[in-house]
């Protein structure tokens, strides 16, 4: 199947996918804890009969049962060397079931390993893992690919890049979302669809985790931005415990009725996940047959993304600032830190610029004495771990830009592409491959254009070259190419003409660097502010500037209000309120503890202050926390006080920010890891005789489940709060868990399960604890777990995440 054929298929009407595989294999006798792919090959009739029933129910696309047949997952069972043969044989089973009546998609999913910087797995290693499986599936003859049940946008990117480096078959990508409408890693559906369609996915959507009703608003949000078809593959409701068995509560008729609503909302590719059966798919197919398919957008909206957010660039929208500070030019302190390999100032600049209103951050590492490529990659990792703001990759070297775009977990902006023959032929394909937008710089080999006519001609020529490379005007922002008014009195007027030309003739947004206009003049800030105000009136969309320069920022907010842009009055008032609070004294003031009089508490204004240790935990800064901890100790503070007065309050605030969805999993992990370093440093210094030993907690992922991201974070958080934690790992039997609890005299057992097929193993642990009379409470959590399920199996508590688990434990042991 070609990509064009796939697109035509989705335009003809609703495309029907298959339903659940795992829950149906389990019903057919597949035990928990075995490798699903190996069991399927040992029982081929089970999968072929199931998939034949799906085809008879009207399925257009079958998912081959290759879900976890990647090297990392297969290695859990000692089967990594059989990867190629297993994928080939599993695809053959699906092709046999399809018998030419349905297409077969090679199925890939998460590896379970955490990517750097949260884990040890490097991005390129993950691409290799997916490329190996994609190559095997391609050679097996799949018609297309699906990357499904994904929680990490960066893992999605790795999979799509890997497939695209193997072949040009269609690729569908589907993520799984939590009740708050975000993935476990904090990605919202708009960010996901924008990033992945730009990268080359042919359909983007969501599956698993919820029933169809909860998916409806997510599909509606995606449809506003999607230039590709949207996929929806919900569970048959949420899992419940009935007569000792896990069941899903949506009947085929209820499921189909919800499917019709998903179709109307914009999902044209529909199927079922956990708990669905061929009957669910048959009734769904009947319900959506002949229904109107909502066509994707023909023109993409101009949107940049990070892993956890997006910035839309609208021709008539509110003015945006690209923060310029992360650039060593003219910054001796930053240059010195970069030469030492220190990114503390970079991190601080990123946070300050985001706080001061920058919607995009420019990253430039161009200086002598460092490896620019290496430092660019390190900076991209550091900044994306610190802030949610999309990035603009700024370098004179094509290879630096390409490497940064490859590892960037979103859709970035390139600064910049000109008509210089040495670079344009290399940069445009790079922008296309990685789905980036770019700043069009109207320069040519001849240098600066002599007038507006020549400048506009260069703009048109670069646009034509971009279209030849598969890009469009929607991928472009034009740089006005600001010259100094001191040397050319018409410089500002020429820029205004270009801004107006791009807005009204080309319908393309514009950007400029402000500082050139006033070069060589006294009191430059006033010239810059006046130029900015006039430029916005002529159509300027965004500027590369320092968001800490309040005169410029305030002028931009006021200009938007005077031009009556959408919600600009509220934005202006919000800006003034922000400044009022800033100068009245923030609730939190950073204090570096150099002396004994700076231990935290209250400053002279009465405002609450916090130590740099507190701030390091709050911001997840592993680079500084040990030094800041040493500074507190040097100031005379007792190690126990450092923990109780600084570390614990800080991690409590992190938990509160996580609860209100201002922080997401990456920030939670970063903060917990930073605190861990401080605890490890302090531990040998603690006064053991005065230290109260906290209770023991045994933690495990239940038998048959090899997912441990959430469990590992729970372990880390509980240890940071001083509990003695015994981590039994993953795929642990009920007997082993209870034995460990008895042996270690545990006060609590904590159980994790990601898959619906392993939930019932939790009930086994609860039953054994009660049967043996073990004096121990049991708490549970995981993606498919609910509070009602915890009550049904007799558990003592349910936690929705790691931060909640700490509160639950303290409440139970209170």
How would you label these PLM feature ranges?
Residues 1-479, 483-814:
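Domain-level signal for soluble alpha/beta catalytic cores
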């Amino acid at each position: 199947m070609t990509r064009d054929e796939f697109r035509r298929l989705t335009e003809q009407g609703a495309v029907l996918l298959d339903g659940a595989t795992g829950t149906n294999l389990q019903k057919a006798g597949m035990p928990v804890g075995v490798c699903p792919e190996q069991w399927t090959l040992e029982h081929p009739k089970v999968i072929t009969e199931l998939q034949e029933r799906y085809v008879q129910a009207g399925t257009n696309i079958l998912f081959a049962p290759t879900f976890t047949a990647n090297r990392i997952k297969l290695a859990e069972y000692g089967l990594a060397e059989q990867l190629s043969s297993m994928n080939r044989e599993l695809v053959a089973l699906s092709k046999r079931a399809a018998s030419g009546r349905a297409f077969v998609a090679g199925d890939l999913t998460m590896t379970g390993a955490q990517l750097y910087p949260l884990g040890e797995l490097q991005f390129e290693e993950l691409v290799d893992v997916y490329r190996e499986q994609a190559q095997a599936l391609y050679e097996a003859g799949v018609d297309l690919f699906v990357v499904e049940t994904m929680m990490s946008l960066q893992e999605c990117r790795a999979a799509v890049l890997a497939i695209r480096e193997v072949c040009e078959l269609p690729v569908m990508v589907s993520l799984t979302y939590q009740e708050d409408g975000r993935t476990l890693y904090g990605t919202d559906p708009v960010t996901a669809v924008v990033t992945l369609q730009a990268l080359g996915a042919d359909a983007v959507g969501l599956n698993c985790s919820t029933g169809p009703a909860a998916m409806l608003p997510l599909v509606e949000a995606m449809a506003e931005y999607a230039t590709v078809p949207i996929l929806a593959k919900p569970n048959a409701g949420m899992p419940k415990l009935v007569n000792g068995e896990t069941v899903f509560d949506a009947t085929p008729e209820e499921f189909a009725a919800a499917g019709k609503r998903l179709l109307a909302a914009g999902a044209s590719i529909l199927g079922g996940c956990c708990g669905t059966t061929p009957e669910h798919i048959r009734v769904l197919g009947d319900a959506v047959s002949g229904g109107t398919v909502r066509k994707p957008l023909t023109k993409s909206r101009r949107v940049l993304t990070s892993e956890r957010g997006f910035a839309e660039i609208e021709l008539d929208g509110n003015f945006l600032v690209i923060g310029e500070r992360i650039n060593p030019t003219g910054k001796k302190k930053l240059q010195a830190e970069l030469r030492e390999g220190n990114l503390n100032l970079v991190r601080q600049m990123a946070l300050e610029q985001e706080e001061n209103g920058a919607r995009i951050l420019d990253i430039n590492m161009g200086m002598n004495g460092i490896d620019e490529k290496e430092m660019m990659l390190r900076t991209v990792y550091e900044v994306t771990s610190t802030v949610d703001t999309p990035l603009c990759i700024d370098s004179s070297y094509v290879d630096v830009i390409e490497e940064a775009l490859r590892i960037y977990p979103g859709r970035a902006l390139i600064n910049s592409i000109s008509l210089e023959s040495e670079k344009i032929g290399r940069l445009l394909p790079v922008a296309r491959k990685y789905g980036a937008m770019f700043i069009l710089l109207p320069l040519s080999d001849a240098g600066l254009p002599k007038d507006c006519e020549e400048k506009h001609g260069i703009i048109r020529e670069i646009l034509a070259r971009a279209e030849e490379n598969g890009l469009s005007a929607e991928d472009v922002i034009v740089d006005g190419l600001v010259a100094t008014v001191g040397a050319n009195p018409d410089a500002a007027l020429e820029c205004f003409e270009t801004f107006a030309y791009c807005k009204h003739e080309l319908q393309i947004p514009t950007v400029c660097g402000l500082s050139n206009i006033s070069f060589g003049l006294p009191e430059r800030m006033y010239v810059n502010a006046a130029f900015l105000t006039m430029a916005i009136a002529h159509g300027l969309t965004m500027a590369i500037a320092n968001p800490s320069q309040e005169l410029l920022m305030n002028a931009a907010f006021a200009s938007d209000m005077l031009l009556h842009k959408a919600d600009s009055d509220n934005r202006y008032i919000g800006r003034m309120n922000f400044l009022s609070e800033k100068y009245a004294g923030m609730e939190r003031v950073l204090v570096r503890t150099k002396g004994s009089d700076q231990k935290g508490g209250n400053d002279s204004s009465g405002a609450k202050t916090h130590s740099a240790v507190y701030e390091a935990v709050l911001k997840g800064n592993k680079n500084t926390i040990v030094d800041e901890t040493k500074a507190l100790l040097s100031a005379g503070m007792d190690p126990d006080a450092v923990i109780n007065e600084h570390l614990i309050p800080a991690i409590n605030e992190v938990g509160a920010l996580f609860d209100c969805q201002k922080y997401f999993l990456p920030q939670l992990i970063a903060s917990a890891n930073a605190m861990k370093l401080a605890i490890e440093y302090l531990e040998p210094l603690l006064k053991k005789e005065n230290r109260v030993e906290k209770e023991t907690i045994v933690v495990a992922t239940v038998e048959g489940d090899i997912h441990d991201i959430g469990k590992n974070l729970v372990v880390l958080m509980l240890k940071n709060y001083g509990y003695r934690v015994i981590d039994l790992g993953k795929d642990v039997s009920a007997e082993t868990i209870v034995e460990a609890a008895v042996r270690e005299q545990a006060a609590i057992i904590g159980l994790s399960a990601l898959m619906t097929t392993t939930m019932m193993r939790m009930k086994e642990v609860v039953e054994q604890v009660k049967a043996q009379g073990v004096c121990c409470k049991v708490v549970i959590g995981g993606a498919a777990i609910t509070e009602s399920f915890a009550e049904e199996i007799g558990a003592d508590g349910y936690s929705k995440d790691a931060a909640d688990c700490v509160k639950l434990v303290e409440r139970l042991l209170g």
